[in-house]
Amino acid sequence: MQRNPGVVAARKHWEALERVPIQMRTLPDPQIQVQEFTVGSPKPAAGYETSNFYYTGFGISQEIPGPGKLRLQGDIAEQDAEIARHQYKAAQREAAEKIRESYFELFYLTKTIGLLESERSDLLRIEEIAKARYRVGEGQAQDVLKAQLQATRMLNEIVHHHREMQQRQADLKAALGRDLDSPDIVIGAVEPTRVELDRAQLGEAVRRQSTELMIDRAAEERSEKALELAQKGYFPDFTLGYAYDKTGPGFRDYYMLTLGAKIPLYFWRKQTPAIEQAALERSAAREQVRAHELDAGASAEDQLVAIHASDRMLKIYAQGLIPQAENSIQAALAAYRVSKVDFQTVISAFVDLLNLREEYYRTLADHELAVARLEQIVGEVK
């Protein structure tokens, strides 16, 4: 998963933003000045020996933001990095969910293809029984044709699933950051993941572990710092300077210390609206936290309901429906051999068993997909 391009990009973005706070807490670069003041002529050194107004000067000045501004700028940058860190976690979870989605779809397709190939062999044996009965005058040609038609349908489904498997393999390789021409990924066995969470535990997990909420809370904290910084806009910024001016021979040198201040003279048009803007953005960030908490809770609840429902369905398939369907096909075959039921009954029993087995694997895959979607919201739940 660490080779997934989206995950790599999110990590690099986070690492880049971690370099910003120290920059924002650092004073602006000082300015160095070199100047020459001539007298009576623009020519260099004019008045050097005749006027005490001539000088060649060297100076340095430093901008100093108002008290607390640099600290708050650094705090805001830290929150930007924190947001990026949670976005990196979210990218990891999203990539994991996509990987698992493709994997479990491949699992379903692999199992279904194996099932279709196995059941097609059983169908060919049923077809042979129908042919044998037809040869001795106890069956109909229509029975053989029905078996052949069902076998063709199954073959068509196998071809369709193979085509879909190729697409899913491509999706899985892309999610893993592998080349498309790399070897296909082997699909192993899958067992239902046990999820033992009640609604209270689920709500707590959402509040503590949802990456979307972590992003929103970091954004809310950022908006708090941005409001504090906006309020600091009423305080002036300063410029401190020092200069040394060398005069001609016989005259005294000059030494100059300066202190300047940037006054927020038009505060009602700049600083006050900026504070109002920051306050509104803080309110929006708070509401966003609440909105995402409700959305994440509802989504997690939906997935938990789906998990519990599929748990029950898997037990019903494994312990009830499939064994009953297996008994039904055996009974139908036995009755068909002695002409107690028609061939349509046998085909119907065969198709019922095939569909139930396919539905079992579909339910198992959907169960694991729901677990993957839940873990995208709240992290690991095993």
Residue spans of the language-model regions?
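Bacterial Sec-pathway N-terminal export signals of envelope proteins
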Residues: 1-36, 43, 49, 54, ...
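Amphipathic alpha-helical coiled-coil segments
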Residues: 7-24, 91, 95-116, 125, ...
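ATP/adenylate-binding site constellation spanning eukaryotic-like Ser/Thr protein kinases
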Residues: 29, 96, 199, 235, ...
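Small/polar-residue-enriched beta-strand and adjacent coil segments characteristic
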Residues: 30-90, 214-292
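Short, charged, amphipathic alpha-helical segments
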Residues: 74-78, 141-149, 343-351
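Periplasmic alpha-helical coiled-coil/stalk elements that build and connect Gram-negative outer-membrane
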Residues: 88-207, 303-306, 310
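Short helix-capping/hinge motifs at transmembrane helix termini and TM-loop junctions
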Residues: 137, 177-178, 339, 378-380
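Metallo-beta-lactamase
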Residues: 161, 211, 363
